[in-house]
Every structure is written in C-alpha cells, then in structure tokens.
C-alpha cells in the first residue's frame, strides 16, 4: 500500500469506527436532551394493584393515569398528572399475580436514563399464598427480599404502596377461610415491613387507609381494583409522584 493512501479494508474500518462514534454520540445527545427537557420516566413494579388493566372494560391501570390522565373518564383529575408538568413517559413492568420473589424478573434488562421514579405494590399475593396464617419467619423473609429488590433499583425515589383490605375491616366479609384475628395480624406485619423499607428509599403510600374509606365499587373479583379502584390507586400515589 502506498503512503498516504487507504486500502479498501482500512477505509471500511475507519467508516465503522465513525459509525460507532456517531451512535455513541447520538445516545449521549438523547440522554442530554432527556435531562435538559425534563423528561421523567415512571416505572411500575409489582402486582395487580398496578397491573389491573384486564380487570376493567377500559383497559386502564394506575401508571397510565399518573403519567397522563384520561380526562374523559376522570375530568376531576384534569391537569393532575406528570404530563401536565413536562415530558413524561411510562415504563410499565408490574405483573398481575406477582409476589416478592417475582420482582427481580420485572427489572430484567432495565436501562434507566435521566430523571426517573418507581412505584411498587407487592405483598397481597404473598399474604394470599403463604403469609396470611404465617407464625414463623415468613414475613421477615418477605421483608428481606423486598429490601434487596428496592435497594438494587437504579432509580430514586421509590414509592411503595402497602396492602389494602378488600373486607373493609369487617370480619363478616372474611373470604380467606383463616382466623380473621391471625389474618389481620399478619396483614399488619406485612404493611409494617413495607413501611420500614419505604422510608429508606422514598416513602410509603398508604393504600390500606385510603381504601378503607371506599366502597365495594372500588373492587372487582373480590380483591382486584375496578376502574374506579385503578383511579383511586392513582389518587393515593399522586401526591408522592407529583
């Protein structure tokens, strides 16, 4: 090869490096644009409290409403969403039926850029499956797993919703077939664990107390949020998210 001239292979190599540089620069520009324009991403993790679109006829879940309210369905919440305050997007990762052991899978291939916050609801299915009559280390094991997951998340703050009570505190509405006294004790233990963890990474959202003020129209299939319930979950998270 003569001095001062590039071979075809050398030219292709340099072109490839230039292309890679352009891609890297593009990613950097996108990240800076997201920060400069104030784009915020809301991440949802957890169970059907956040992944409840299949339980209402409009396919609505709380994360959608927090990012952009449906003004036709819920005119009272017009202007009360992240999109009204700037650029916002949703990354919905919560999965109906999830327990605490399923949370790490929801964060697989997670890539966080720019401003971001996370909301989590978990514990209800853990109670239904194992913890409602637990008299051993079950709640402590749940707490350790939840703390490990939240600690591993690359975004802050993280807002954790506690577990609501579809019986509205009325033992005559017991649908579990378990001594209500023991069930309520363990429900309280799970919520106490969630509260303790939430303080470390953001704050707790008290779904339990909020839903005690509601009525059966907030639920469907006994324990799932209805369309109204999805909006009420949104209502509970809204002050923290905004």
State the predicted function of each range.
Residues 168-206:
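Substrate-gating cap/lid alpha-helix
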Residues 80-86, 148-158, 190-205:
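A structural motif corresponding to the C-terminal end of an alpha-helix
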Residues 1-18:
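N-terminal secretory signal peptides and thylakoid transit peptides that target proteins
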Residues 100-141, 165:
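Oxyanion-hole/transition-state-stabilizing segment in secreted/luminal serine hydrolases
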Residues 33-41, 102-115, 145-154:
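Short amphipathic alpha-helices and their capping/turn segments at secondary-structure boundaries
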């Amino acid at each position: 090869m003569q001095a001062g001239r590039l071979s075809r292979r050398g030219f292709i190599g340099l072109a490839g490096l230039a292309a890679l540089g352009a891609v890297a620069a593009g990613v950097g520009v996108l990240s800076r644009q997201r920060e400069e324009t104030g784009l915020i991403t809301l991440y949802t993790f957890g169970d059907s409290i956040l992944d409840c679109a299949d339980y209402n006829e409009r396919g609505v879940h709380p994360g959608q409403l927090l990012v952009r309210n449906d003004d036709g369905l819920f005119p009272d919440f017009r202007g009360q969403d992240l999109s009204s305050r700037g650029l916002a997007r949703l990354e919905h990762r919560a999965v109906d039926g999830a327990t605490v052991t399923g949370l790490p899978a929801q964060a697989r291939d997670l890539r966080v850029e720019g401003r971001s916050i996370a909301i989590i609801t978990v514990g209800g299915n853990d109670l239904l499956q194992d913890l409602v009559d637990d008299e051993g280390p079950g709640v402590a094991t749940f707490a350790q797993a939840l703390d490990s997951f939240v600690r591993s998340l690359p975004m802050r703050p993280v807002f954790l919703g506690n577990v609501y009570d579809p019986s509205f505190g009325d033992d005559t509405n017991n649908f579990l077939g378990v001594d209500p006294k023991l069930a309520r004790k363990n429900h309280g233990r799970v919520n106490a664990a969630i509260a303790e963890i939430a303080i470390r990474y953001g704050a707790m959202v008290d779904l339990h107390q909020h839903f005690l003020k509601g009525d059966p129209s907030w639920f469907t299939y006994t324990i799932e949020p209805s369309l109204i319930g999805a909006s009420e979950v949104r209502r509970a998270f809204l002050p923290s998210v905004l």
